[in-house]
């Protein structure tokens, strides 16, 4: 193999097997795809050690992808439940899974996911550092942080969130500009605390070249974490967020110089009117790198319904340039999601992604809607169920409320507009009060 990473291959004019897979899935010319990978505008996260991977592309002109977060915590350490979530997420056609386990020795769980998963897998190595070394945060050395990054890369993860943008300069801006909700990124808050406790630079920023060397060796895509993402709509598009975004743009170019693929992570909580501008800012400041957003959640008043606040923001974000949506569940801000929470979060996120793809004229997106509308016109219930984003729920609703006549539903009955227009357009009579002949 005469290339190190997908980006290195693309720059050399080499079309990899992963590029061919993505080209076929997306209906995009493979040479155009290769050029965009070379430019950093598309990434194909594909760790050399992830042998079961069915490659996906993320970025310009491709379908919007969704990620599902899962993993164990100290309060909820049921590995079997998390593995069941993995299986369900794959069945529901999520394109990526992130293991955000934050308790104990996570290696076994991570390795099992890599072995069983055909989808992209991501991690946040700093979450693992405390459990990996069984040390308090402030006692972990920069070299030890880097060793955890290498371990995750060896284990086969395709992308890693690295919060390298929260350096001492960004921290100064944060201190000068008061926020309502401070730093809500878990990884970002841990690194900020480490910097304050040790009076040192963020090790992922100070030794960024070493991080890139690890990523290049295994072809891990670096997902540049947004430690200063807004945790409330009050804090959105503030000095800390923008200062960090500028730094992430600089780090993006440094990664590309070493042929490391880059995703940039984004907000967060943000009111509707700010989303489009934020997408444009990221694309400009980060040189067209794919944008991976958590939401954005468009209001802060809906605990229990944040899959909805997130889907609203995610649809607008993806319609304006975001490439990758991190799902949010109804359990957000409340608890570790259970299986049903996860399912609702996936469906909400997939709806947002598809709505954006329709808006962006992504190949095949409108055709799906056309087929559904065609099935509705035909009152072909089975076809509607098969085309539904959640066939199980659609079938259950129909089954739980059976109409008198098969060609109606219990909402309108014989006043069904579709049924009656079909008959009138065919020159037939309609009977609403009496039985049909």
From Swiss-Prot:
Record GO cellular component, one term: cytosol
Binding sites annotated in the UniProt record for [4Fe-4S] cluster? 409, 412, 416
Q: Does the keyword Metal-binding apply?
A: yes
Provide the catalytic activity annotation: 5-amino-1-(5-phospho-beta-D-ribosyl)imidazole + S-adenosyl-L-methionine = 4-amino-2-methyl-5-(phosphooxymethyl)pyrimidine + CO + 5'-deoxyadenosine + formate + L-methionine + 3 H(+)
Q: Which UniProt keywords apply?
A: 4Fe-4S, Iron, Iron-sulfur, Lyase, Metal-binding, S-adenosyl-L-methionine, Thiamine biosynthesis, Zinc
The UniProt record gives the binding positions of substrate as 69, 98, 127, 163, 185-187, 226-229, 265, 292
Q: Which residues bind Zn(2+) per the record?
A: 269, 333
- Which pathway does the database say it acts in? Cofactor biosynthesis; thiamine diphosphate biosynthesis
Q: Which residues form a coiled coil?
A: none
InterPro entries in the record, alphabetically? ThiC, ThiC/Bza_core_dom, ThiC/BzaA/B
Among the record's GO biological process terms, what is one? thiamine diphosphate biosynthetic process
Instruction: Identify which top EC class this enzyme belongs to.
Output: lyase
Cofactor binding: number and manner: Binds 1 [4Fe-4S] cluster per subunit. The cluster is coordinated with 3 cysteines and an exchangeable S-adenosyl-L-methionine.
Domain of life of the organism encoding this protein: Bacteria
Cofactor field: [4Fe-4S] cluster
Its transmembrane ranges are none
Question: EC number(s) on record?
Answer: 4.1.99.17
Give an example GO molecular function.
carbon-carbon lyase activity
PANTHER family on file: PHOSPHOMETHYLPYRIMIDINE SYNTHASE, CHLOROPLASTIC, THIAMINE BIOSYNTHESIS PROTEIN THIC
Q: Which family does it belong to?
A: Belongs to the ThiC family.
Functional note = Catalyzes the synthesis of the hydroxymethylpyrimidine phosphate (HMP-P) moiety of thiamine from aminoimidazole ribotide (AIR) in a radical S-adenosyl-L-methionine (SAM)-dependent reaction.
What is the protein name stated in its UniProt record?
Phosphomethylpyrimidine synthase
Biological classification of the source: Bacteria, Bacillati, Bacillota, Clostridia, Eubacteriales
Q: Could you tell me the gene encoding this protein?
A: thiC
């Amino acid at each position: 193999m005469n290339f190190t990473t997908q980006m290195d291959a693309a720059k050399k004019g080499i079309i990899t097997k992963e590029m061919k897979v993505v080209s076929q899935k997306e209906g995009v010319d493979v040479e155009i795809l290769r050029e965009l990978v070379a430019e950093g505008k598309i990434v194909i996260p594909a760790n050399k050690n992830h042998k079961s991977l069915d490659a996906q592309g993320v970025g310009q002109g491709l379908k919007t992808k969704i990620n599902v977060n899962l993993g164990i915590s100290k309060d909820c350490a049921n590995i079997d439940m998390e593995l069941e979530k993995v299986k369900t997420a794959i069945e529901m056609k999520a394109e990526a899974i992130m293991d955000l386990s934050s308790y104990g020795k996570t290696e076994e769980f991570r390795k099992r996911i890599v072995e069983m998963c055909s989808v992209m897998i991501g991690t946040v190595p700093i979450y693992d550092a405390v459990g990996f070394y069984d040390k308090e945060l402030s006692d972990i050395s920069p070299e030890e942080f880097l060793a955890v990054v290498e371990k995750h890369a060896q284990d086969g993860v395709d992308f890693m969130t690295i919060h390298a943008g929260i350096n001492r300069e960004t921290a100064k801006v944060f201190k000068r500009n008061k926020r309502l909700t401070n730093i809500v990124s878990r990884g970002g808050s841990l690194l900020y605390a480490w910097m304050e406790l040790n009076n040192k630079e963020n090790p992922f920023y100070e030794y960024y070249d070493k991080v890139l060397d690890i990523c290049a060796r295994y072809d891990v895509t670096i997902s540049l974490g947004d430690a200063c993402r807004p945790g409330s709509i009050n804090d959105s598009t503030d000095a800390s967020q923008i200062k960090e975004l500028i730094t992430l743009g600089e780090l993006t170019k440094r990664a590309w110089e070493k042929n490391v693929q880059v995703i940039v992570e984004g907000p967060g909580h943000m009111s509707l009117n700010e989303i489009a501008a934020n997408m444009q800012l990221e694309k400009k400041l980060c040189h067209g790198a794919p944008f991976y957003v958590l939401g954005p959640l468009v209001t802060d008043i809906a605990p229990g319904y944040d899959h909805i606040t997130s889907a609203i923001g995610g649809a607008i974000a993806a319609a304006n340039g975001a490439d990758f949506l991190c799902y949010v569940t109804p359990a957000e801000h409340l608890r570790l999601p259970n299986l049903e929470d996860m399912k609702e979060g996936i469906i909400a996120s997939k709806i947002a992604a598809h709505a954006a793809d329709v808006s962006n004229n992504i190949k095949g997106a409108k055709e799906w809607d056309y087929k559904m509308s065609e099935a509705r016109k035909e009152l072909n219930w089975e076809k509607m169920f098969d085309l539904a984003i959640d066939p199980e729920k659609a079938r259950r609703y129909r089954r739980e409320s059976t109409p008198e006549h098969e060609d109606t539903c219990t909402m309108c009955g014989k006043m069904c507009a579709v049924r009656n227009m079909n008959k009138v357009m065919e020159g037939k009579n309609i009977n609403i009060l009496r039985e049909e002949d």
